From Swiss-Prot:
A Pfam entry, by short name: GTP_EFTU
Binding-site residues, GTP: 287-294, 357-361, 417-420
Lineage: Eukaryota, Fungi, Dikarya, Ascomycota, Taphrinomycotina
Protein name: Uncharacterized GTP-binding protein P8A3.05
GO molecular function, one term: GTP binding
Segments of skewed composition (Low complexity): 32-47
GO cellular component: cytosol; nucleus
Residues in tr-type G domain copies: 278-492
């Protein structure tokens, strides 16, 4: 007899009504099927009769032999019982004590289980629908088992109960995968990497800076820039304190005036304060079109930290926006671009110069005057040569080198651009340098190989650091910035000498203002300038006073040689660009006659043609007579044509139509440079330096 039959017989013996305790197998299966029909068939639900039968079986003390066989129905019942017990139910067993009334009814818990089963089935349906819709399933998809589903559901139910009880103590988390599935939202496939296209980058459109460049930029910002910013503030405070002391030392009638801006410092005080001012060197960037001038200029500015990111975003070479560099960097009317080097902390100025300005097809008089006067103030020239087209533009470079030699400008260098496109090949670089040297040898003499620098303006290589393995294996000289700093060292003594000279500045641009006033843009060539200072304008020495002085430099209370300033002056007769302004009547000698060491362009001298002489950064006068000294004899221009063909450098005597300021070479070289221009202002005839003056 089976164990189940023995159990039934024992129950009948006790004469208990079967309606109250249905313990038969048929009744057990019937109740299971009826209870399961009310709920989804995925999970078997528990019922009250099951609990009663388990209690009844546990109450019996009958022991079944181990080897006793069981029927198929008994195995099925045990299997369903095992399946039911494998899912831990959240409902609590009804205690046998009196606290049973306080617990939730079993039917409510049964309904809750039915709802959970329904949600889980919907979860699976959504998952299956997503797999069918997506062609490439996500690698991050997590396949949960039934146990995981049940556990996840229980955790979310507990969290929702806590949120209802203590809504302020529970922190809300992002939506879970389960919540997204319930709402029908499709999951997006995660990307392992995020690619940012260079053309859409907010900072640069070319390659990112190297680690060396990042360090150098950090140094320039943190050390040099901050250091000199403090020095500029200290200098401005010193100027204000000196003016305040000078104001207090004035007579009693002027002490009530609290404005110290119009108080002038003495020359000794200015010289002492000028020791805190950074030296200034002026660079000229020259090269044929498409040789990489603006790319070089922009990348150099970026690497030394002169640009803020907002300005960088506007440049053509830095992003996809088609804006020219000159339209972005509008610092002054003359388009000089200021920057500072971090090694020696010099303040430098650079300009992009057109090579064709000295050809017969040059532009108008004003444009020629503006560009030709740059050679009278420049210290260093940088020529850009495309390594892919090295011979392009060498004719213009040859003419400018002749001009620089005649003006005693020996500081220049050649930047061989786009070297990254030939993979920094040493042999190609050497052959390129040899071809340039041989081309310029006849007209300009031998050029040292140390003046040639291989660079890449696009990638920034060899501008501030080499940071390229192949280049560092054979190039052992300085970077472009290192050579600029060395040239600034050589020009430092000249700059100090300029500060001790009388004040001289020339007007580059004039804008009329109401009330008989004019707004002027000027370049200071020597001396130092203060606001409300008394000045003398032009050869007529008209007295005036400058007001509203400002500059693009950091405010320091005064301006020195090399600065470009803006100011207001009363409108005067014959006030025009190029006119000289000085602080003393006898500061510069005006003369009609001078001896000049001149260098002539080939075939530029024409018989019977008049010329203009440009001196002192824009001042000019008509040349009436010219005498050349060859073979120790004075000859007229029409008698020395053949001699000029043989000897292009000669001593000349000039006689001008009207007297204008000229400076001897012994005074200072940059102030003594003169240019000879054709009558139509379209070609350069000769250039040189003034050796002596005669009344």
């Amino acid at each position: 007899m089976s164990r189940l039959s023995q159990l039934l017989n024992s129950k009948k013996a006790k004469q208990k009504p079967p309606s109250e305790h249905p313990i038969g197998l048929s009744s057990i299966l019937k109740q299971d099927s009826s209870s399961s029909s009310d709920s989804p068939n995925f999970f078997p639900s528990s019922s009250t009769n099951d609990h009663q039968e388990r209690d009844t079986i546990n109450d019996t003390n009958f022991v079944v032999p181990e080897k006793q066989k069981t029927s198929k129905l008994a195995l099925l019942a045990a299997e369903r019982k095992k399946l039911h017990s494998s899912f831990p139910s959240t409902q609590q067993q009804p205690p046998k004590t009196e606290k049973e009334k306080e617990k939730e009814p079993i039917q409510a818990k049964h309904k809750k289980n039915v709802e959970n089963d329904f949600l889980l089935q919907r979860f699976r349906k959504v998952r299956i629908a997503e797999k069918k819709d997506s062609e490439q399933p996500s690698s991050h998809e997590i396949h949960l088992t039934d146990d995981d589903d049940k556990t996840t559901l229980q955790k979310q139910m507990v969290e929702s109960d806590q949120l209802k009880k203590n809504p302020q103590e529970v922190k809300l988390a992002p939506p879970s995968s389960f919540a997204k599935c319930l709402t029908g939202a499709k999951k997006r496939v995660f990307e392992d990497q995020i690619e940012i296209h260079l053309s859409k980058s907010s900072l640069l459109g070319f390659n990112a800076p190297s680690p060396d460049d990042i360090v150098l930029m950090a140094q320039s910002k943190s050390k040099s820039f901050q250091k000199h910013k403090r020095l500029d503030e200290q200098l401005l405070n010193s100027v204000k304190s000196m003016k305040k002391v000078s104001q207090q030392l004035k007579p009693q009638k002027n002490t009530n005036d609290s404005n110290n801006d119009h108080t002038l410092l003495s020359q000794d005080q200015l010289i002492e304060l000028s020791k805190l001012v950074k030296p200034r060197t002026k660079l000229l960037l020259l090269g044929p079109p498409k040789s990489g001038k603006k790319t070089l200029l922009s990348r150099l500015f970026f690497q030394i930290g002169s640009f803020d990111p907002k300005t960088m975003q506007k440049c053509t070479v830095l992003n996809a926006k088609k804006e020219s560099l000159s339209s972005v960097l509008k610092s002054t009317k003359t388009k000089w671009y200021d920057f500072e080097t971090f090694s020696n902390s010099y303040s430098s100025t650079i300009i992009d110069f057109p090579l064709g300005i000295f050809t017969t097809n040059a532009s108008s008089r004003d444009n020629f005057l503006k560009h030709s006067s740059l050679f009278q103030v420049m210290n260093t020239a940088i020529f850009t040569i495309d390594c892919l087209n090295p011979l392009e533009g060498l004719d213009g470079i040859s003419s400018i080198l002749q001009l620089m030699n005649g003006l005693s400008i020996s500081s220049y260098m050649f930047a061989i651009t786009k070297m990254d496109e030939i993979e920094w090949d040493e042999n190609k670089f050497i052959n390129l340098v040899n071809s340039i040297q041989s081309f310029l040898k006849e007209s300009c003499g031998i050029i040292e190989k140390s003046k040639f620098i291989p660079i890449s303006g696009l990638k920034g290589t060899n501008l501030t650091s080499i940071s390229q393995e192949k280049l560092s294996q054979w190039y052992k000289s300085d970077t472009l910035l290192g050579k600029i700093d060395k040239e600034a060292d050589t020009n430092h003594g000249t700059w100090n000498f300029l500060l001790n000279l009388p004040l001289s500045l020339t007007i580059s641009h004039i804008t009329p203002l109401p009330e008989n006033q004019s707004h002027i843009y000027c370049s200071i060539h020597s001396g130092m300038l203060q606001d409300s200072q008394k000045l003398y304008v032009g050869t007529g020495r008209l007295e005036t006073q400058i007001t509203g002085l400002s500059s693009d430099e950091n405010p320091k209370g005064f301006n020195v040689a090399g600065d470009m300033i803006q100011a207001k002056i009363p409108t005067l007769p014959n006030l025009c660009p190029g006119i000289l302004i000085a602080d003393s009547i006898d500061a510069f000698t005006s003369s009609k006659t001078a001896y000049v060491n001149a260098t002539w362009f080939h075939g530029s001298l024409e018989k019977g043609k008049s010329m203009h002489v440009i001196a002192l950064f824009g001042c000019h006068a008509v040349l009436t007579k010219l005498y050349c000294f060859t073979d120790s004899q004075e000859k007229a221009p029409n008698a020395i044509g053949n001699d000029l063909e043989r000897n292009r450098t000669s001593l000349v005597k000039i006689e001008l139509e009207n007297a204008f300021p000229l400076v001897k070479e012994s005074y200072i070289n940059t102030l003594s440079r003169v240019l000879f221009v054709s009558e139509k202002w379209n070609s350069l005839i000769a250039f040189g330096t003034v050796l002596s003056l005669h009344d």
